[in-house]
From Swiss-Prot:
Annotated Gene3D superfamilies: Jelly Rolls
HAMAP family registered for this protein in UniProt: Salvage_MtnD_euk
Protein name per the record: Probable inactive acireductone dioxygenase 2
SUPFAM superfamilies with a match to the protein in the record: RmlC-like cupins (SSF51182)
GO cellular component, one term: nucleus
Disulfide bond residue pairs: none
InterPro entries (UniProt xref): ARD, ARD_euk, RmlC-like_jellyroll, RmlC_Cupin_sf
Gene Ontology biological process terms from the UniProt entry: L-methionine salvage from methylthioadenosine; methionine metabolic process
Location, primary (coarse class): cytoplasm
Gene Ontology MF term list: acireductone dioxygenase [iron(II)-requiring] activity
Length: 159
């Protein structure tokens, strides 16, 4: 995982990094302090370790449902979906996502017009607290498979 402050008004391809200049990277600890976002690295190759970590998160966050969501250029209405995912939103429950394959960005907004970009890759688990404005996009590879976690069954939830 990599984390940095984004330029205030990114222009062009939103799938690019959009660092401020000079780049201002932050740590997972700083991200937690600034935005309340939690991060865990999950070793997907170590089944016992993975189950232990996921079980702890599920218990702590009262998770009962999961799904696997794949974003790729082959999906129906890909461009429209990407526009929808990039719209800033807040949720009524924590957004919990584990990247199973590929790479993506979650942008979080701890203060008005001050976005932090979180680049996630395979094995990265993120918990975005309810009520925090966030948005989602892919990297230029246009592919990510995410396992999402919910406290209740949710139909049609986006990023």
């Amino acid at each position: 995982m990599q984390i940095w402050h984004m330029e205030p008004f990114p222009c062009g391809d939103r799938r690019l990094p959009h660092h401020v200049f000079p780049p201002k990277k932050i740590t997972t600890t700083q991200l937690g302090a600034l935005a309340g976002v939690q991060y865990y690295k999950v070793d997907l190759e170590d089944t016992a370790s993975m189950k232990k970590r996921l079980s702890a998160v599920k218990t702590e966050k009262n998770v009962t449902f999961t799904d696997v969501f794949t974003v790729s250029e082959t999906m129906l209405d890909f461009d429209d979906k990407m526009e929808q995912f990039y719209e800033a939103q807040t949720q009524k429950e924590d957004v919990i996502s584990l990247v199973v394959e590929g790479t993506c960005y979650y942008d979080v907004e701890p203060e008005d017009d001050s976005w932090i970009r979180v680049q996630l890759e395979k094995g990265d688990l993120i918990v975005i607290p309810k009520g925090l404005s966030h948005r989602f996009t892919t990297t230029p590879q246009n592919f990510v498979k995410i396992q999402r976690f919910f406290s209740r069954k949710v139909e049609g939830t986006q990023g």
